[in-house]
Structures are given as C-alpha cells and as structure tokens.
From Swiss-Prot:
One Pfam family it belongs to: Flg_bbr_C
Protein's UniProt name: Flagellar basal-body rod protein FlgC
Subunit structure: The basal body constitutes a major portion of the flagellar organelle and consists of four rings (L,P,S, and M) mounted on a central rod. The rod consists of about 26 subunits of FlgG in the distal portion, and FlgB, FlgC and FlgF are thought to build up the proximal portion of the rod with about 6 subunits each.
Gene that this polypeptide is encoded by: flgC
UniProt KW keywords: Bacterial flagellum
Gene Ontology cellular component terms for the protein in this record: bacterial-type flagellum; bacterial-type flagellum basal body, rod
Annotated family: Belongs to the flagella basal body rod proteins family.
Subcellular location: Bacterial flagellum basal body
Domain of life of the source: Bacteria
PANTHER family: FLAGELLAR BASAL-BODY ROD PROTEIN FLGC, FLAGELLAR PROTEIN
InterPro entries the UniProt entry points to: Flag_bb_rod_N, Flagellar_basal_body_rod_CS, Flg_bb/hook_C_dom, FlgC
Length: 134
C-alpha cells in the first residue's frame, strides 16, 4: 500500500467521525425536544459505517452508509400539567440516551484524534524519506 493511500484512508475516517460527532451533537441538542415538525418527539439518530475499499482490495477507508433513526421507544415522563400530556398525564420524550451520546462523542473525538496522528506520522515518514539522500 502506498503512503499516499493512507492519506485517503485516514481522510475518510476523519469525515466519518466528523459525521458521527455531528449526529451525536444533534441528538444531545434535541434530548429535550418534545415535539418536532411532525408533532412527534425527536428520535435519536445513529450513523452506520461501512468499508470503502477499492475493488479487489482487502483494505480501505470507511464511509457513512446511512444515518438511521433509533428504534428505541420514546421515554414517558409523568407531567400531568403539561399541555402535551396524554389522558394518563404522560408526555412522550425523545429516545435520546444522553450518557450513550456522550460516550459516542468521546469515542468519535478519540478516533478523530487518532487519525490525525496517523496523518502526522505518515507526513513525518515522507519528510524523512526525502532527506535520506542528503
């Protein structure tokens, strides 16, 4: 594998982790959004990754295959005075797991940093290669 391919692979990982961070930020921002444009509570999103290898290659980068809605049920919070409460006094809240989203945020951030380090290492190797003949 050529060193230049590493830039493509690490770059794809940076883009994928950036998308993961954006989705986690959106989930956290909407953790208390009781209603959305459709009148329903916000539904947490999840990023699905897949390998992005060139045909015939065993290795490759990563790409975002899709962003899907979490199938976890909405949380029910007892607030009988809330105008959005049902007949039993429960309000449907988003299915966002705040702790899980914080873990996703930290994991994506660490992965992003690791791929930056890969890029810096390859850059350093290429610069050292250029100075070998001196």
């Amino acid at each position: 594998m050529a060193l230049l391919n590493i830039f493509d692979i690490a770059g794809s990982a940076l883009a994928a982790q950036s998308k993961r961070l954006n989705v986690a930020a959106s989930n956290l921002a909407n953790a208390d959004s009781v209603t959305g444009p459709d009148g329903q509570p916000y539904r947490a999103k999840q990023v699905v990754f897949q390998v992005d290898a060139a045909p015939g290659q065993a290795t490759g980068g990563v790409k975002v295959a899709s962003v899907i809605e979490s199938q976890a049920p909405e949380k029910l919070v007892y607030e009988p005075g809330n105008p959005l409460a049902d007949a039993n006094g429960y309000v449907k809240m988003p299915n966002v797991d705040v702790v899980g989203e914080m873990v996703n945020t930290m994991s994506a951030s660490r992965s992003y940093q690791a791929n930056i380090e890969v890029l810096n290492t390859v850059k350093s190797m290429m610069l050292k290669t250029l100075t070998l003949g001196q």
